[in-house]
Amino acid sequence: MRHGYTNSTVGDGALVVKCYEGPEAEVRLRTESRFLRRLRGRLPVPRVHKITPTSVTTRFVPGEHGQDLLDDGRAAEVLAACGRALAGIHRLGIVHGDYGPQNMLFDPVTFEPVAILDWEWAHPGPPVEDLSWCEWIVRTHHPEHVPLLPRFFEAYRREGGPEVPSWGDRHAAMLSRCRDLLDFTARWEPGGGGEKLWRDRLDTTSAWTA
């Protein structure tokens, strides 16, 4: 998958195979397979086809990648849809752990989510983790769409999500997640490119103001 970051994901148009790499790969594989099975029929998630000790194979889901739609001028629709979908996730008492348009596929006509991907970091936790990370993705990879972030938060609230935390709380959650990923990459390849990338991203995020 062109937008994958930490794992190897390949598909043939019928099935998608995700191979887990890096620290705690087995734990992340078990987490993702468990949540995909648990959430099937409750949220738009791919159907599990096969699980091996190193990979999860799911059925292919046709749809447009969220980041591609942002680049194609559909940021308002995509961010609103992200907000609605996230409220549904949080109603189940879970946190996705890597939430945002980078892990979503959308119907190209209605712009409704057809698949929420990459559940390997899912866990019980506070909503601010997902709210702040979706915002971080936009601020980092699509800064031109930062003015449209209110569409995301407003849709989340309209769909029944709790009150959106303050900028200070969201910023603190972003920094915490960046530190987690810095630690992850440092353990995976000490002194490598991933560690440098996340150190730079942590520094950049630290300098942000509302």
Indicate residue ranges for each PLM-predicted region.
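ATP-binding glycine-rich loop module of kinase domains
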Residues: 2-30, 37
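Conserved short submotifs of the Hanks-type protein kinase catalytic core
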Residues: 53-65
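Conserved HxN/HPN-centered segment at the entrance to the catalytic loop
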Residues: 40-52
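Conserved hydrophobic "DFG−1" position in protein kinase catalytic cores
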Residues: 11-12, 19, 50, 60, ...
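Active-site activation/catalytic loop segments of kinase-like enzymes and analogous catalytic loops
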Residues: 130-161, 177-190
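Active-site acidic catalytic loop and adjacent metal/ATP-binding pocket
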Residues: 7-11, 87-129
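ATP/Mg2+ or Mg2+-diphosphate-binding catalytic cores
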Residues: 147, 181-210
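Conserved kinase catalytic-core helix
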Residues: 39-43, 66-102
